[in-house]
């Protein structure tokens, strides 16, 4: 690798927003390395990090609340470009001598801001121009407070009727603040705004590319594991497949993959995994049949958080059993990625509200015998896919829909039973098969079936059927932080429903989930 891809770096300080790591995703898409650190990062650590620019992210709190987070003094002492987003703008304004007040009109969702001032941040960037020549931007708002008085040196850059200071700028110091969220895809020019800050104002070079990331990850893995052996749980999903390819390239035969058949996998998945990796790629793969153990532990358990933790603990137990058959296994590799971390805690500050735990994050026991290797931990899903292609994995594998670590265990609502898993497997297979036939599989970001533990009356032929209900779920998203339900053709939905009810005797009714994220999550549990 000819260049240090970490040489030009942006520091993102997290105040607890669920969007914080999405900012990092955008900065990396621009091609610049960045790291997220908690808002109370020490002044010494900030100086040592030597960022070319700093982004103050959003957060759920108000600057008026007791003990609400503030930016460290080093943020201002470094005299590097500064960009405050939402709460980041508010605390920046308040700490520099401005004023923040609660807004009579809270803005959540789409808004149009008028660009009423001049500054490098928004120069030449607009969605609309009205008859009077006023530039407008379509943005995403999410705030209850607003800046009412700017610090010395700032001027108004953009405004809305209910938020006169929707953006502020001080070009002399390269300090900027916006009340909207440029990191969210609903802000149409958001990536251009962030690019302007990162590339032009901060002067960063775009060194963060797939080929450089692969080289860096391989070097990091080799430095971490040395000559030790590594175990990887290989599910056949995108994340674990990319990890397998990356580790196989980095350490070769030091890698042993364990495919755990937990009884909660997709139809024919076990055979497909073995064929792809063991036969085609030459990776060492051990197939462990642990269906009885998993289903036995899950019997009688309905709480989704408890199910996740049981699956996580049992997963590690199976690895322990396999590791004892091998010598000198020190590391456990996982396909943990950024969204896993985001939804488990929002970030490291403890300020964000926990939505759900993740199999790769919150369900692992503290006495785990292995050290973790997580080469994808800092990557978003689309970055992982680009890395997979860079490593030579097939397109259809790399762009396969995400599958949760706990598998069908979190797509069966309530208690998990073998009967439910078998029915769900068949229904899910039909849904995916028809999505491909109608050329809708790659138009959706994720699609699956959910088993609902309720029965409904149906009529098949001349007979009455009292059987289970399933729900189809399909979403469209770029970043998995926000998602809308996929507007599938009625003909497709009808075909899927008819096939499921006619071909699977245990199912009598099919529904379609039309919930978006937020407020719903993509998975039901």
From Swiss-Prot:
One cellular-component annotation, GO: cytosol
Active-site residues from the entry: 86 (nucleophile), 181, 183
Biological pathway: Purine metabolism; GMP biosynthesis; GMP from XMP (L-Gln route): step 1/1
HAMAP family: GMP_synthase
Secretion signal, residue range per the UniProt entry: none
InterPro entries: Class_I_gatase-like, GATASE, GMP_synth_C, GMP_synth_GATase, GMP_synthase, GMPS_ATP_PPase_dom, NAD/GMP_synthase, Rossmann-like_a/b/a_fold
Repressor is among the record's keywords: no
SUPFAM superfamilies for the chain: Adenine nucleotide alpha hydrolases-like (SSF52402), Class I glutamine amidotransferase-like (SSF52317), GMP synthetase C-terminal dimerisation domain (SSF54810)
Name of the molecule in the record: GMP synthase [glutamine-hydrolyzing]
Top-level taxon: Bacteria
Keyword ATP-binding: yes
Catalytic activity: XMP + L-glutamine + ATP + H2O = GMP + L-glutamate + AMP + diphosphate + 2 H(+)
Domain Glutamine amidotransferase type-1: 9-207
PROSITE patterns according to UniProt: GATASE_TYPE_1, GMPS_ATP_PPASE
Function summary: Catalyzes the synthesis of GMP from XMP.
């Amino acid at each position: 690798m000819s260049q240090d891809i970490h040489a030009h770096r942006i520091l993102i300080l997290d105040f607890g927003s669920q969007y914080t790591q999405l900012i990092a995703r955008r900065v990396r898409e621009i091609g610049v390395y960045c790291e997220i650190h908690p808002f109370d990062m020490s002044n010494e650590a900030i100086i040592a990090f030597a960022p070319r620019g700093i982004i103050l992210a959003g957060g759920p709190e108000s600057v008026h609340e007791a003990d609400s987070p503030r930016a460290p003094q080093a943020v201002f002492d470094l005299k590097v470009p500064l960009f405050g987003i939402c709460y980041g703008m508010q605390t920046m304004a308040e700490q520099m001598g401005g004023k923040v007040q609660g807004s009579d009109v809270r803005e959540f969702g789409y808004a149009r801001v008028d660009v009423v001032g001049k500054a490098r941040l928004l120069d030449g960037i607009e969605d609309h121009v009205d008859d009077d020549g006023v530039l407008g931007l379509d943005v995403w708002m999410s705030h209850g407070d607003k800046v009412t008085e700017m610090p010395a040196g700032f001027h108004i850059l953009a405004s809305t009727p209910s938020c006169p200071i929707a953006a502020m700028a001080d070009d002399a110091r390269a300090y900027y603040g916006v009340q909207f969220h440029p990191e969210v895809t609903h802000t149409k020019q958001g990536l251009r705004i962030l690019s302007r800050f990162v590339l032009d104002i901060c002067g960063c070079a775009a060194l963060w590319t797939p080929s450089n990331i692969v080289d860096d990850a391989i070097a990091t893995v080799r430095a971490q594991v040395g000559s030790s052996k590594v175990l990887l749980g290989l599910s056949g999903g995108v994340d674990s497949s990319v990890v397998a390819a990356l580790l196989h390239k980095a350490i070769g035969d030091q890698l042993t993959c364990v495919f755990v058949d937990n009884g909660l996998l997709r139809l024919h998945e076990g055979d497909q995994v073995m064929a792809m990796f063991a036969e085609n790629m030459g990776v060492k793969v051990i197939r462990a049949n642990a269906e009885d153990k998993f289903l036995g532990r899950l019997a009688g358990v309905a709480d989704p958080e408890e199910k996740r933790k049981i699956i996580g603990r049992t997963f590690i137990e199976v690895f322990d059993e396999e590791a004892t058959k091998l010598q000198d296994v020190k590391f456990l590799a996982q396909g943990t990625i950024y969204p896993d971390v985001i939804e488990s805690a929002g970030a490291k500050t403890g300020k964000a509200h926990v939505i759900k735990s993740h199999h790769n994050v919150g369900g692992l026991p503290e006495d785990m015998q292995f050290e973790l290797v997580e080469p994808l931990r800092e990557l978003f899903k689309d970055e992982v896919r680009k890395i997979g292609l860079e490593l030579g994995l097939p397109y259809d594998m790399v762009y396969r829909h995400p599958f949760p670590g706990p598998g069908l265990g979190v797509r069966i609502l309530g208690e998990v039973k073998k009967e439910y898993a078998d029915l769900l497997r068949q229904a899910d297979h039909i849904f995916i098969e028809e999505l491909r036939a109608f050329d809708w599989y790659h138009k959706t970001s994720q699609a699956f079936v959910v088993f609902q533990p309720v029965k409904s009356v149906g009529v098949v032929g001349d007979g009455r059927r009292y059987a289970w209900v399933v729900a189809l779920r399909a979403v469209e998203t770029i970043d998995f932080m926000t998602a809308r339900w996929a507007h599938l053709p009625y003909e497709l939905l009808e075909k899927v429903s008819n096939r499921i009810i006619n071909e699977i005797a245990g199912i009598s009714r099919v529904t379609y989930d039309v919930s978006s994220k937020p407020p719903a999550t993509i998975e039901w549990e």
